[in-house]
Structures are given as structure tokens and as C-alpha cells.
Amino acid sequence: MTGGVAGKAQALAAAISHPGDVLVNLSGGKDSTATWMHLEQSGFLQAKREQGWRVVFAFADTGWELPETYAYLEKLEKLVGKIHRVATWVPGEGEAPPSGYDLLVPQWATAGKCLPADRAALARRLEARLGRPYSPLVRLMVAWANVPTTQRRWCTEDTKMKPLVGLLATLNNPINVIGVRAGESADRAAQPVWEWSEAHDAFVWRPIHDWTVEQVIELHRASGVDPNPLYLQGSGSGRVGCAPCVYASKADLRWLVQHQRLRLEILGEIEEEIGKLNGRSPRWFSLRKVVEDSDGARVAAVPVPVSQAAEWAQTQRGGRQLGLFLPEEAPGCVAWGMCQR
């Protein structure tokens, strides 16, 4: 890649003028769906097709989404066409690759390693509890005898980024289209609309970077494309994706208690099983409980298991009072104007 602003501009112009592949990432979330609709309705994708470009849609499967998201992606595929499923591949001994994926990127297999029989059996049991034929995140947790945390959030890199980078490596002169908005976080606000990514070996384009959430909702409404149904249930912080994320808010946790309690029960089982493997007490959430000595002096603050985090999510007054009658939050359908449908 030629250095400097001029070099980037020159390479960008070349990338756009020479036919290649446009990779549009779809997650089942509102922003990536809005990105596809925007590019389709603006005529960008059709123009690229006419110029000889290939448009590729892809979903990086963490194996940690809720069933509603997987069902929504199948529905979305009827509108956009083929969605390539990519994932990190962590095999058990003698285990055949799972069906339903277009690309599996080796993780442990790169070193010729496989999960031993007992750990592979544990992974399959947890996958069955999730209702998934294969879960990259579960496989990596079992393989490494650890869970991701806010301090060591390896989940994004190992279950989303690496498979997508593997897919990009198979494409020709790709432009990687990502549906993120500046309003989501300070980190995303600092990202440019266009950039060259050494990690991706491709240009990255964020077409709706300056959009508001209201614009995203309005595009869905105007296009007649329903959002992921999880948004209409409220979905805690208003975002869908890994459930739960290690960065889950109190609202996210409370929503899971109310709507997806089984997922929290399974996460509790995962904490317990991983604890048996590593001899410690791994905790998914960063919530801590103060431990005091007999004199009432603070001794330590220890992470709590998911069951206690779920109890805390239903409290008020800083966790001091159980909220038997928590104030009702406006349902997600209010923001989407779809409560009467």
C-alpha cells in the first residue's frame, strides 16, 4: 500500500475502477440491514454489478446469537440472495466439518490440534443446549478452558474477525462494507468512512457512518422491511448480537431474564463446566460483590456468577432493593412504530 494521503487516494480510485468483489457484512442487526438497503436503493450495488463487480453477502457466525437472529437471517436471505456463512472451525477428534457453512477457518486445526474426546463431547452437549449444530464460541471456550471477559475480549477477534479475514483472502480486489454508525460508541465515531485495512488487506467502507438511529429505523419503515424481531421486544440496550455480550448492561440482563431466561441458565452451566476444566471460577460478567470481614471492613470485590448477576439486574436503588415492580420500559416497537402490527 502506497503511503500518505495521496497514495491512499490513488489506491482507492484504482480499487473502485477495477472490477472486483464488494463484501457486504450482514449480522441480522438493524445497521447492517440498513446498509444493504441503502446501497441497493441508491443504485450502487446494481452499478457495480453492471461494471463487472461481484456482490458478496456474508455473516460471521459466533454460534452465540439468539434463535430469532438466525431465523431473521434466513428471512433476509430471501431478499438479498445468497448469504455466505463463515465461522471459526475447532474440530473434535475425527469430527467432520458441520454443514451449512460456506467457509470454515481453522483455529486449533492450524497447529494440527483437535479437541480431545471428552472436551468435544462437552462442547456438543452445550451446543445441543443452545439448539445449535455448531458454536465456534463454545468450542473455543472449551478448548481454552476460559471465557471471554471485558479485560480479555478475544471473542470478537477469534469468532468474527478471523473468519471474515479468511473470506476476504478468497476475494478479488475486495471492498469490505461494514454497517456501523458513529453514534454507537466513541470508538466507532473515531473510525473513518473509508480506510485501508492492513489486517483485512482491503479497503473498508462504512456507508452509514454518519447516520442516526432514526434514519435507520425510517429506512426500514419506508422499505417495508421488518427489523429483527428482537428489537420489537425491547432487547435491553436496543442492540442485538451475541447474547449475552460480556459488555451487557443492566438493561440487557434484565431483558434476558424476562425474555431469554434459558440463555442465562445455559451460560451458568458454561461457567460451571469451564470452572471444572481450569480449576477456577470463570465469570462472564464484570459485576463484583464486596466481601467484608467480621468487623465489616471491605476485604475484596469478587466477580459474581451469572445467577447473581441476573438477580442484581432486577434490583433498584443501586442493587439494594429487589424491584418487584420495576418501572416498565417502553417496548421496542414504540421506537419502530410497529406496536399495532
Q: Where in the sequence are the language-model features?
A:
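Secreted/luminal cysteine- and crosslink-motif detector
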Residues: 115, 156, 243-246, 334, ...
